[in-house]
Amino acid sequence: MDTLTVPGGGSSAPAAHDPDSSRHPRPGTGSGAVASRPAAESAPAPEPGPADPTGLDHALVRALIEHRRTRVARLPSRKRVDTFVDAAVGLLFPQQSTDGHANEEHLLARINLLRAELASMLHAVLPPQRSAETAGQLIQALPAIYDRLRADAAAIVEGDPAAESLDEVIAAYPGFFAITVHRIAHELNRLGAPILPRLFAEAAHARTGIDIHPGATIGRALCIDHGTGIVIGESAIIGDQVKLYQGVTLGALSVLKSAAGQKRHPTIEDRVVLYANATVLGGDTVVGHDSVIGGNVWLVTSVPPHSFVYHTSQIRVRNVADALGNSDYSI
């Protein structure tokens, strides 16, 4: 085959020798001489060969090494983030932990381990002194976070007839797990730590299907029922005793990148219920307190308190002939 040239001047293989040329010399050539083929007939198309470590591979390796020298390359792995999230949630709620120890000495040791691990992970995005300070501040905030989470769990028990106990909600409800991780990530985000809060949020997102940006502000006693597909944007503000069903989106209208840092997501006031697949968009959109937003509603304007907003389905009664024909919808 022809020589395959790769970046850097290396060759993957020498040109193949034509076995017929020496046995059957062409007219005009000496005995045993090798005749040259016309360029158009030189050889078949090159076949894929092994990569050349002196050419393209070296260029790729150099690029990968350079990437690993950046700060991004030193971020904690997904496995490490998941382990920390599980440890933090398990510390607050033993229903989500396999560690049954409950004495003071053991719990204090676990808290210190969490602080040290968080500071270590923060080294990738903050200076060492700032990393230790931020980790300590998050640990100091845990009592207030725990208090809010107890109120969240109680709201789910009260709001879901299928929930039989507080223990069941804490141990089994994906909505509660997502809220727990969010409250930790939100505090870390408030303390100014970059990137890591988002990694925490994505750990919960991957596990529950609930996507809450760590920048979102959420009041007390949030009830998430089912939860799959919920999206809450960065600048969303949610009041107290709000109830969200699956598929709810609190999002932004399409904006330019220059709008980053501005309020792009809606405000949901106290005691609002948003039913399945309701979509509320825009930073100027305010849903007034004690309102109900029905399923499949698309809302981009504010509504006053005590509003009931619903989507009206179109109902068409078919005649008998239509009913006996092909269905309008198929799966």
Predicted features and spans:
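Left-handed beta-helix
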Residues: 208, 213-214, 219-220, 225-234, ...
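Short regulatory "switch" loops immediately downstream of catalytic or recognition motifs
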Residues: 95, 250-256
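Short acidic loop-to-helix transition motifs that present clustered carboxylates
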Residues: 205, 217, 257
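Terminal amphipathic alpha-helical/low-complexity segments used for targeting or macromolecular assembly
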Residues: 1-202, 324-331
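Extended hydrophobic/aromatic segments used for targeting, binding, or gating
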Residues: 257-263
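Short helix-capping and hinge/turn segments at secondary-structure transitions, especially at repeat
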Residues: 189-193, 205-209, 223
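C-terminal membrane-proximal segments flanking the terminal transmembrane helix
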Residues: 280, 318, 322-329
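Short, positively charged
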Residues: 192-195, 263-267
